[in-house]
Amino acid sequence: MKLAFNKLLVASVVFTVLSFGLLLASLFTTTATTPSEWTILLPEFRFPVNKKQTTEQFLVEKIVHEHEEGEDVRSALYLTHHGYFMNAIANMKVTYRQKSYTVNDVCFKPHSAIFENVPAPENIDKLPAYFQRLLLEMQRLSPCLIVTPLNCFYDSYHIHSEISNWNASTDYLNRRLRNSYLEAIEEKDSRPYVKSTYGPELIKEWARHMFAIPSKPLSNFSKSDLYSRVKTWLSSIAARKKICADPMRSCDETLDAENYFNVCTVMQQINDYDERRKQRLKFQLEYGDEEFTTRLDCVEDREKFIEWMQERNLRDMLKLFASSVEIPDHKEIPNQVCDGIYHDLDTSSGLELFRGARSFSNNTSAYDTINVELGFMTPENLLTTMRHSDFVNGFESIWTIERARELLNEFRLALKVEVTKFSESRSSRRVKVTTRIVNQIEEEGSDEEMEYHMIYFILGACALMVALFAAFAFSEAFLTSLSMFLLRGFITGLLFIFLCKSGGLILIDSNFLCYITMHLAFNLVMTARVTFICYRIGGCVQSEKDFVKSNFSSLGSVPVDSLKEDSCKRHVQYVLAKYTKFQVAQDAYSEEPFEKLPKYWFLIAIVLVPVIGVYWFFIDSDVQKICIVLLPAFLIAAFEEMRVKNQLLRERRIKKAIQRLQKEENTRIMSRGEIDNLLSGNAELSGEKSHYESKQGVLHHGSAGGLFELSRSTYDVSLIMAYPNQMIRNLRLCALGAYFRLFKMKYCAVVVSSVAALLILLSIGLLFIPVQRSSVPKELQQDELSIDFAIPNVSSSSWESINEYLEEFNSEIDSITNLQTITNGRRVLINSTSKINNFLKWVDDEPISWYLTAPLTRPYRKTHLPNPFRFQFRYGFDSIQKSTIIDVVERIDTLLTKYTETLSFPKAIGFLYEHYHQKAVVWNSFAYHEIFAAAVLAGFFSIIVVFFSIGPVVLPTLAFAFFVVGNRLEIAAIVSLFSLEYHQCYTNVAVFVGFLAAWTPFCDLARFRGRLLYKDQTRRTPELATQRRIRVPHVAAVDTVQIFAIFLTATILLIVITAIIPQFRAFFIPTVILLITLLLAVFNSLAVSLAAYQMFEHEVRHCYHDQLQSLTTTGKVCDMTRKKLLPREEDLSIPMEEFSIRPTENTKHYAPRPIDNSDPPEQAADEEVVNQDPSMEAARRQYVEFTHRTTGMPIELINQFVDNFPVFNVPANFLPNYFALGGAPLDANNGVLLRQPGIAPPPRPNREEDEEERFGLGGGEDDDSYPSSGDDIGDPAKEQQEVTDDVATRYKEEEVRKKVQPAVPNYDDPNVPGPSNPVPRQVEQVSREAPEDSPNREPRILVYQRPPRLHEIPQISHGRNPLHDPPSMEEYVQKYDDPNQPPSRRADQYPPSFTPAMVGYCEDVYWKYNERNLPDNVPMPPRPRDWDQRRLVELPPPEDFDEVPPPGRSAIPIPPGAIRLRERRREQHLREQEARRNRPESPDDTPGL
């Protein structure tokens, strides 16, 4: 099989080239500019409701203090209350695996940026042990990341001191540092002694001693550099100026109850009433305090006693600030940068991350809420920190990522408990402040479990699909089909891993699940397709291998009149098997294939490039991944089908060789005189074994995997079409019967197609319906927004321009109200606009600021920036009102669009931003996006139809594209109505499944239509079939039904599983959407099949009606004779045995009867005697002269024709041809056809009863309509006498009529010479006198019948004047005899049953100018529908009597009589006009009731 004819392989190669082209384009786009997300018209959006907002380095837990009455919280009272809460968090502990952990162990510490490159795994082993110990202890003492308004005061120092244990356990810290120092020095060296109660002071002293120890030089850094980093760390944690939140207290006083034990023991040791009264005044106790404190135990009730002391302190503050509590004490805090101890070397400025405005927000009034943020390490960072600690301490690390997650979850749960307890404490109730966590605590391990559940679900769904297909589609070839399925999957996986990874990773997300779904469906469909061809259809073809040059015409004539509801299923099964065999036989055995590529297929392939490019650029930038997922299955299936067909052709050649050898062997045996042995059964056999062995009426091949054929005595195909089980067989039979009934229903196609089209149009309308989208629950809100920049190829020349654009961007985004700046690095970039080296110097000098303000920027070396240069600006929403956020989102989108080119596509990320962006912006353009995508895909599918189909037409192609993309629009409408996420995945799967469902039935129907309409271009064509006969495309439709029934079954089972198992609940909605997608795809596929079937059937009927005028055996004989007259060298001979014509003993010909009919039949039997009769010679001469005169044929050719028929002189063999063969009139193009006496002409069919059969898709064979013998023909002599008498009678009547009235030429009469009929065609009077030798002297009329013409249309002697001569229908029939001629443009103005010849006859110009002057025998044909409108348009305009002729002499002389006539008409017109003007008004003209 030639590669050019294997369309599937050519198409797969074309799409492979396009896919890799898109892949290269996406790679170049990603590396040269930005990630590929910017190329899509509508970005993907998701709802991360259950996910914490994370950055690259840490997790954030947000806590809110909210005043119940909306008072301003910028006062010492509420800041002091907030300080109590921070102390409670600092003392929080968690026990995990029998070990106690504090917040200091899990919090994120930005000061580690100072030593970012030092504790790296590749560098840590190169440091001395005492340096490693020093770095570990410095990391433990580093402050945690806490964003709080207390960063503006000295109070934050005490909080971090409590968390990091700066003043506690200094002896233990001192001992570990001293031991590491002593291990590094020799015994003779001095051993210093350091003592301090402040942890950082111990670090400072021991660092001075450790760096004085002589050691080997370090490779990656110097000791001086490391020591400078230690100094930087010490200066960065130094306390700021002592500005207290409570101006009435000293900053040295602690905010907690560190001396509570002394107070408690004093209160409980006093028993005397007077002493208690004195202590009450001393401690300022109120009523009830004494009783409360005396009941507490100083050891067991420590927390309750501290809580009471905090409440007492707040009571005192309320008394002091009672008159001015409504006036805030610290109104300037929102305008300050409160970084606390997070400052760098430059202590005069802080970090924008700790801007005061970020610590306050409003709920019911301005500044009624205090915001707190705690930074925790990510599980990965926590794992690295714990392993580093175990390594330095010399322990074997037992930490894993799962344990790190568990420890973080324990702290988050403990934080929730601590917040709840503090919100219910005495101090919170006193100041009416509610404390809560903004983000709900996730379930333990939910993210990780979700990933595992997704993997389990994907594997389970794949296994279920494969099992169902193996049981119900792969038949007995299970192992082969399964191996090919796994091979396709393995190759696809390898290509996807190597070509579709992003940054070395492949995310198992919704897109990955979409790719899995599409590949699984396509791989299963292609495996089933190849299985059908190889092991089911291929087996049926074997039965026709004996007929090496067979055109399989017998397969196209299976009547299905008995296929009713009560029909035999065995018979239906036989019909299905036979037509399956027929379909594959045409593809596998045709030396001249039916399915050819279009003439300019390479141009069509080029057109695919811009279409796919537009889809990739504007719709989905990951379309190359979809192509890579599908192409391996496509390519392997194409090669596998080519291999199977080549194998079948090779077996066919082997069969021919075996037959040739057997023929030669038989010839050799006959030549050796071994006929006796052959007849006696003792013939010499060849050495080969018998090729066939009989078994149960079916012949099987002896070798493995060889040929086998059906026995001709049975039609039991159970051994050939081996179905997996009876269920599949019944399903296919039911589907086949359902298709029969649907196609037989008259208006079924119109109803189904209309309903499907209305459903698609309704879906388009639903896309534009405004739907009220649900908002995010308030407790799940995250009011942060980050804008990520990734600027490629930053150089010294572009650095200044980038800073200018960033400055403009900052100024515009600062103008947006309700959006506060967290950090955008503006100060950093402005201070370093001169050179890039200034920025790199700032990165090295201020590591904390760099670490917090630009976490995405990591220069590999200090001399240049990474490519692309990544950094992040962070903002926060002041208000979480829906209208406010929508306004901010729209303005941010405008800014991002404005700076797309200059700042390389900045991208906004944030929970609230993405959520409200989806609600306010994305859904508004969702409808336009889907319609644009549908239009692009419709063009793509139209090109595919043109690429694959033979002779495509416009309407079926548009219908196919419309219904396939309609599946996407319907799913998009569902997504829009229910606001579903992952819309791109749903719509991609929808359009892909719709194409799979509709393509195979439509493609096979289009190919079958091409075989019927273009049968002249091929040598082997299926026979014409009436409307009651089975069509081949039903097989493809039944295969599609079988495949999608399996898909629907698997999807329903998955829905049940996801509804029952709680872990799979997240996949319930996607599975339901998949089920709806499959149902819509099947319905749209049915609509496509019915609509295309009706269009093709009408086209084929029209074609055969004009071409053959009959669909009986006669029509086939005419077609065969035409091929005989115009043979081609490459044509194969068409044996007569293929047609329903039986041979007879005698042969009769069309010819006129002899003149003398008085001789007895016995004398005519002797041929020689008759030939010598002079009367016969005279008759022969008269016949030749008449034929020459009427047809214009040369006399030599007529004599040669008469001489070739020796039975010409037998009078009984002359039959009149006034009737047509098969009951249909024949013209000259049919040639001389021989009539056989064994077959009589069938009766003319009834128009009303057999109209469907006459104009069906093809003409079938109807053996019952022909007689079995020649007796039904009748007596030829009697028939001739009747014709002669009838002609004589009509001749006499015509003579009488001519004498009465003058003759009017009747050009429609074929006997009247005219423009289209130069000579009479039927009757001519030869002689009115009787022959002299005849005994009967009465005049006799001799009638000659015009024989059929043998060659082209006779020449017309003169042309017809269309203005005076009426047209002839015969001329238009001859003019429109070409079936490939396009239809008339005026055909829509006439009934559908009108042929092109009839339309041309009605549109002749003669009827326009002779409407009122027609001859008597020329009737007016039917007028078109727009006749009235045309008459009004084409009528001459009214005469203008006021027209003044132009000056000068006219070029055409005007007769004087014409001028006088015009003047008389003008005067008459003026008189009538004046009379109408002077006419009195009629009373009837008066308006009234």
Curated annotation (Swiss-Prot):
Q: Where is the composition biased (Basic and acidic residues)?
A: 1275-1298, 1326-1340, 1423-1433, 1460-1482
**Residue ranges, annotated region (Interaction with fem-3):** 1138-1288
Describe its membrane topology: Multi-pass membrane protein
Q: Where in the cell is it found?
A: Membrane
Say yes or no: keyword Cell division present: no
UniProt-annotated stretches for the region MX regulatory domain: 1402-1423
Task: Kindly list the GO CC terms recorded for this protein.
Answer: membrane; plasma membrane
Q: What happens when the gene is disrupted?
A: Null hermaphrodite mutants have masculinized germ lines, producing only sperm. Animals make incomplete male tails, producing shorter stubby tails that lack sensory structures called rays.
Using the record, list the residue span of the signal peptide; answer none if the entry has no such feature.
1-33
- Positions of the UniProt region annotated as Disordered: 1143-1176, 1233-1393, 1412-1489
| Alphabetical list of InterPro entries matching this protein | Ce-Tra-2 (IPR032848)
List all Pro residues biased stretches: 1444-1456
Keywords for the protein's UniProt record, in alphabetical order: Developmental protein, Differentiation, Membrane, Receptor, Sexual differentiation, Signal, Spermatogenesis, Transmembrane, Transmembrane helix
Listed GO MF terms: transmembrane signaling receptor activity
Per the record, the domain of life is Eukaryota
Q: Which residues cross the membrane?
A: 454-474, 489-509, 513-533, 600-620, 622-642, 749-769, 931-951, 958-978, 986-1006, 1041-1061, 1066-1086
Q: What does the subunit comment say? A: Interacts with tra-1 and fem-3.
Tell me the protein's name.
Answer: Sex-determining transformer protein 2
